[in-house]
Amino acid sequence: YDYGMLGLDFGRLRAKYIHGFLESTENDINRYITARGIEWTNRKSLVIGLSETVIYSGEDRPLDIGYINPISTHLEIELNDRLNTLGTGSANAVWQISGDWLINQKLRISANYLFDEFVLDKIEFDNGKEHGKAYSGRISYTPIMSETTLLTTYFSLLTVGTPTFRHGNGYNNFVQRNKPLGWQYGSDGQEFKLGLNYFNRTNLIAQFEFGQRKTGEESITSRPYDPYADYLAGPFPSGIVEESLFITSKLQWWWRPSIQLNGGVDWDDNGS
């Protein structure tokens, strides 16, 4: 999609803002995306970030100047009626905290946690309502690091909740042209992976992954523009669950400085 971006770098502190146009649907609904984030680093081994991403839409809706201010937030804009449309159902926001920690030259940990819907009222919790959320984590270890070989192993986990990335107005879902924004399998799912990366530091890169994936019937990939049914807690993944084991491998080889050969294999058992 087309977007404009503003970035600021103050050394240990960095900030970034984007505003873009996602698409116009067949019934003249214009859809936009805007995001702002701030990141702190110790310039050695640690990066911590906070971000907010918003999708807003409306029939023949123009670019909303309420979101032009890079330091404004979705809740502040919406609750103070600064949008170019009435009400509080014309936009959908998610908030994310992330971290990346290089413990030493061989060990690295990264993680992300995303909120889509906050549930703060005890009554709502008692009625079975839950946060809309997603999270991921990765641990990588480099047992071989020499002048001729770089070998890294890793384990990763990713979970996206059942109603996450959906909205009461389906045109504010995190999708573009029927494809999810984010994890390619949408939502209502979980994935584990073990992987291996190899680089001979000259002309060969190889990657191998093995993992398991589970997706439920409420994934945003099946009904991209439908609103969520509710935020009530339930079995996860929901409904009929599709489970699969998968293996992927990729290879890049520079045979000559001007000739590169690429190859890959993707396999899964497509079980359910």
What are these regions (language model features)?
Residues Y1-G49:
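Internal, well-ordered domain-core segments that constitute the primary functional module
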Residues L46-L50, V54, E59-S272:
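Exposed, low-structure sequence patches enriched in small/polar residues
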